[in-house]
């Protein structure tokens, strides 16, 4: 089996299925058809600027895939689903990286960092993809999604950028908290760790109060539930802490 990173961007429009949901569907499709394994999907925030078209937040969606499928097979099946599910007004792009191949990871990560703070052209994205032997293709509209798709690969490679798509729902509510051990949280969610906002890794027997919207992040190349300490009690991190990802 080989290791791949796959990222898509700009598949949606107001009132249509979100890019994150489409990415999850592609991840499950590729894993199930090949007996492989797909990771959580991570959402990577890109530059918000009047010159950049976006639906709501301008973010790319990326996942890792371990699979015996060839790159051609991955591209064929992923693109078929991408095209079928993308909104008619969207400008979708997809990037596929063979993680086990030789490529300039520093250049790819630099592209990702730049895409968070500046406007980048399609030509620049295609030039870098060609240099790094990354498959980068557009599938409708202006094809602007290729920029975010390539940037998302770089940001995922950095290892400490992005939130895990969706919310963690273990029985907590907006006004009702739930207390669980770290071990229970990891077992029920499939996350790798529970860490404080200053990167202290909680022990398995420590307890955390969950309340409201609970989201995980990608930190130190792991899927992590962020927490903070409040009145000597660990609680899930709030919106402000999550904005850094």
For the regions a protein language model found, what residue spans apply to each?
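Conserved mixed alpha/beta catalytic, RNA-binding, or beta-rich assembly cores of soluble enzyme
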Residues: 2-245
């Amino acid at each position: 089996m080989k290791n791949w990173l796959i990222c898509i961007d700009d598949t949606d429009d107001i009132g249509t299925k979100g890019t994150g949901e489409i990415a999850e569907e592609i991840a499950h499709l590729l894993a199930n058809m090949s007996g492989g394994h797909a990771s959580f999907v991570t959402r990577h925030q890109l530059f918000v600027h009047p010159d950049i078209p976006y639906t709501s937040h301008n973010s790319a969606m990326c996942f890792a895939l371990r699979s015996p499928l060839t790159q051609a097979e991955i591209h064929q099946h992923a693109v078929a689903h991408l095209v079928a599910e993308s909104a008619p007004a969207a400008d979708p792009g997809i990037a596929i990286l063979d993680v086990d191949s030789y490529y300039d990871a520093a250049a790819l990560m630099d592209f990702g960092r730049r895409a968070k703070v500046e406007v980048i052209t399609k030509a620049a994205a295609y030039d870098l993809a060609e240099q790094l032997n990354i498959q980068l293709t557009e599938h409708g509209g202006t094809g602007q999604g290729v920029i975010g798709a390539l940037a998302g690969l770089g940001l995922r490679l950095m290892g400490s950028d992005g939130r895990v798509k969706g919310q963690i729902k273990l029985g907590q509510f907006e006004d009702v908290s739930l207390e669980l051990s770290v071990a229970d949280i990891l077992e029920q969610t499939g996350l790798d760790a529970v860490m404080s906002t200053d990167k202290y890794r909680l022990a398995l027997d420590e307890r955390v109060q969950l309340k409201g919207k609970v989201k995980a992040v990608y930190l130190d190349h792991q899927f992590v539930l962020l927490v903070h300490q409040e009145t000597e009690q660990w609680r899930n991190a709030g919106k402000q802490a999550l904005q850094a990802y």
